[in-house]
């Protein structure tokens, strides 16, 4: 960037800087707010995390295929991304994601992919006004119950062992032009977590591929729906042929705890 701006050669700075700081202060983490498609470049320079505004923009637009394309990046890149729905330079998430349903679906995607999840103060309450750093206070707001419930759902998923210590993979949709975003967290000795979100503006009936879940018969337990307390059993053959089938409203989501049966 400096070379392009000032038209003169520059010595690489960040690697030397980060190495020197870490030599004196081991364990220091560095996060870069970076744009212009230079996220991977700064990760390679030694930054622990880089802002992922690409995912943020694509969640706003509701283009499911572009979201999937971004999430197909290498695991090493993904785990160094900062996922967010709001930051200091943008309107608050409750304003940018204009419906609680859009907010919830986008939130579950950002929270259930690898990387660091960044949440601002009051974001989980559905607050729409920025707090004033200069006045050291925030304007009074009532917040929003649907937003609070969405963050409560996400916190339940984040507490699961598979989400904390497992491996992640995207679950591709079955069929073309699907708005469905699917992913799976797996951890040996624990149940897996599967999430499917309709990242679109119309009702979606479809399925995502079951991936490794199709290797054996499975027992699926809904994470969000208290009206369905009993687990559902699915045969491996059915999972291979039909995948995980869903019927979801715009930005609706389903999450399952999945136990593979012997």
Segments (PLM) and residue ranges:
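Active-site and adjacent substrate-binding regions of carbohydrate-active enzymes
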Residues: 1-262
């Amino acid at each position: 960037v400096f070379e392009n701006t000032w038209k003169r050669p520059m010595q690489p700075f960040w690697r030397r800087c980060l190495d020197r700081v870490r030599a004196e202060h081991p364990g220091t983490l560095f996060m870069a707010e970076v744009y212009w498609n230079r996220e991977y470049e700064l990760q390679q320079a030694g930054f622990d995390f880089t802002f992922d505004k690409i995912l943020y923009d694509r969640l706003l637009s509701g283009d499911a295929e572009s979201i999937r394309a971004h999430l197909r990046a290498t695991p090493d890149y993904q785990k160094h991304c900062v996922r967010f729905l709001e930051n200091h330079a943008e309107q608050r998430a409750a304003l940018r994601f204009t419906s609680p349903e859009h907010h919830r679906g986008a939130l579950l995607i950002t929270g259930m992919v690898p990387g660091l999840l960044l949440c601002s103060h009051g974001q989980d309450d559905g607050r729409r006004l920025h707090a004033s750093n200069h006045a050291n206070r925030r304007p009074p707001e009532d917040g929003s119950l649907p937003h609070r419930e969405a963050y409560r759902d996400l916190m339940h998923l984040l507490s699961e062992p598979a989400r904390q210590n497992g491996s992640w993979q995207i679950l591709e949709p079955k069929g073309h032009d699907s708005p469905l975003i699917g992913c799976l967290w797996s951890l040996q000795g624990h149940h897996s977590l599967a999430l499917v979100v309709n990242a679109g503006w119309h009702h979606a009936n479809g399925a995502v591929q079951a991936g490794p879940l199709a290797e054996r018969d499975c027992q699926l337990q809904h994470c969000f729906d208290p009206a369905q307390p009993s687990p559902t059993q699915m045969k491996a053959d059915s999972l291979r042929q039909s995948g995980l089938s869903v019927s979801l409203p715009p930005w609706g989501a389903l999450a399952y705890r999945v136990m593979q049966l012997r």
